[in-house]
Amino acid sequence: MILILEGIGGNVHSVRRMIQKSCNQTVKISNKKSDIEASKTIILAGVGHFDSIMEKINSLESFQLIQKRVLNEEVNFLGICAGMQVLLDRSEEGTKNGLGWIEGEVKKFNQLDSDGNILKVPHIGWNSINRLRDSKLLNKKMADERFYFVHSYYVDCLDKKYVIATTDYGEKFDSIICKKNICGVQFHPEKSHIFGLKFFENYFS
């Protein structure tokens, strides 16, 4: 069973619909301990302020169980957008600590690109990814993968061996990261049409 954590970030119903199109597994939106225990994959679809999301996570009665399942039992965990950002240690957007499951920091985009031109922030729209290493998350036959982004802050992973792909927007940022069973994507697969569908097909294969 695939579990999308409830009441933390937005877009959960859109994420569920896209996952249901991509695989034949049961998908639930819940924070119940029984569902967390039964899940094979846990998804955090985060949209919102870093501190607000961390407050909601820390207030969950099931938070310790989630940590146990992810860190000790190594159940698969996927963070989407801000759900990816809270996997790291800290963010320039807020003052609260992140989960710290992957070392790194979340930084705000500069207002100017490398040529001194004004950079529109937030980064909204379609963008491509630069593959750094092979991963089952990416389709080898689809070299021109493009995904839909909406964010003002970006992930800077400390250990680059966990970075699967980067994206260019004024500067390079980490757009897909994976450390063992824990993965994060900065883009929105649920808004990325055929590319998002294929991403979920690969992830759940």
Predicted regions and their residues:
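A short secondary-structure junction motif
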Residues: 49-55, 85-95, 187-189
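Pocket-forming structural segment of enzyme catalytic cores
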Residues: 90-169
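Glycine-rich nucleotide phosphate-binding loop and flanking beta-alpha elements
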Residues: 11, 49-51, 84-86, 154-156, ...
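N-terminal beta1-alpha1 cap of cysteine-dependent amidohydrolase-like domains
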Residues: 1-77, 91, 105-107, 114, ...
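Gly/Ala-rich beta-loop-alpha elbow adjacent to hydrolase catalytic centers
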Residues: 79, 83
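Active-site-proximal beta-strand elements of phosphoester/diester hydrolases
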Residues: 6, 148, 183-187
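C-terminal and late-domain segments of enzyme folds
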Residues: 154-205
